[in-house]
Every structure is written in C-alpha cells, then in structure tokens.
Amino acid sequence: MKISKEEVAYVAHLARLEFSESEMETFTFQMNEILLYMDKLNEVDTSGVEPLSHAIALHNAFREDKVQESLSQDLSLANAPDPRGEFFRVPKVID
C-alpha cells in the first residue's frame, strides 16, 4: 500500500494542519516508510506466539496504605502565586 501526497494533504486538512510543499513530501515519504515496515511485520509468522497486552508481565505493585505526615497547608501554599486564604486561586476557565 502506498500513500499519495493528496492523501496526506487530505488527512492534514481533516486535522486542520497546514504544511509547506517540502513538508508534504517529507511526510508522504515517512508515511510510506511506516507502511512498508508494517507490511514487513505482517509477513512475520506469529502462529506459535501467544498474544500479549504488554511485552513483559506486569504485576500490581501496591504500597501499604499507612497514615503518615503530609505537607502542611502553609508549605503547600508557600509557592502559590496568588493564594486566597487557605485555597489556591486559579484563573477562570469556564464562563
């Protein structure tokens, strides 16, 4: 499978990206290289390989839930640029 410059331009348009002509050629080449690599991977015989979700076995490593000293309110607010009493004041993000 080969990707054309027009297909890269179409995907860029969908993503609302603008590329110069040289960038378009670079991305077209890179996408085609990725697809060639994927074709090579598809040719590999994996019939005896068990499917995995991770390359190595993962085990949950939980720490014991212990009560311990935490950061005091004064220390946590010490570097706040504009604390409001005992709270962090942040810019409004929703109108």
From Swiss-Prot:
Q: Does the keyword Transcription regulation apply?
A: no
Answer whether the UniProt record assigns the keyword NADP to this protein. no
The protein's annotated catalytic reaction(s) are: L-glutamyl-tRNA(Gln) + L-glutamine + ATP + H2O = L-glutaminyl-tRNA(Gln) + L-glutamate + ADP + phosphate + H(+); L-aspartyl-tRNA(Asn) + L-glutamine + ATP + H2O = L-asparaginyl-tRNA(Asn) + L-glutamate + ADP + phosphate + 2 H(+)
Record GO biological process: glutaminyl-tRNAGln biosynthesis via transamidation; regulation of translational fidelity; translation
Which terms does the record give in the GO molecular function aspect?
A: asparaginyl-tRNA synthase (glutamine-hydrolyzing) activity; ATP binding; glutaminyl-tRNA synthase (glutamine-hydrolyzing) activity
Record keywords, A-Z? ATP-binding, Ligase, Nucleotide-binding, Protein biosynthesis
Task: Return the EC number.
Answer: 6.3.5.-
Could you tell me which Gene3D superfamilies the record lists for this protein? Glu-tRNAGln amidotransferase C subunit, N-terminal domain
InterPro entries named among the record's database cross-references: Asp/Glu-ADT_sf_sub_c, GatC
Q: Which domain of life is it from?
A: Bacteria
NCBIfam families in the record: gatC
Q: Return the similarity comment.
A: Belongs to the GatC family.
The job of this chain, per UniProt, is described as: Allows the formation of correctly charged Asn-tRNA(Asn) or Gln-tRNA(Gln) through the transamidation of misacylated Asp-tRNA(Asn) or Glu-tRNA(Gln) in organisms which lack either or both of asparaginyl-tRNA or glutaminyl-tRNA synthetases. The reaction takes place in the presence of glutamine and ATP through an activated phospho-Asp-tRNA(Asn) or phospho-Glu-tRNA(Gln).
Kindly state the subunit structure of this protein: Heterotrimer of A, B and C subunits.
Name this protein carries in UniProt: Aspartyl/glutamyl-tRNA(Asn/Gln) amidotransferase subunit C
Could you tell me which species this protein originates from?
Syntrophus aciditrophicus (strain SB)
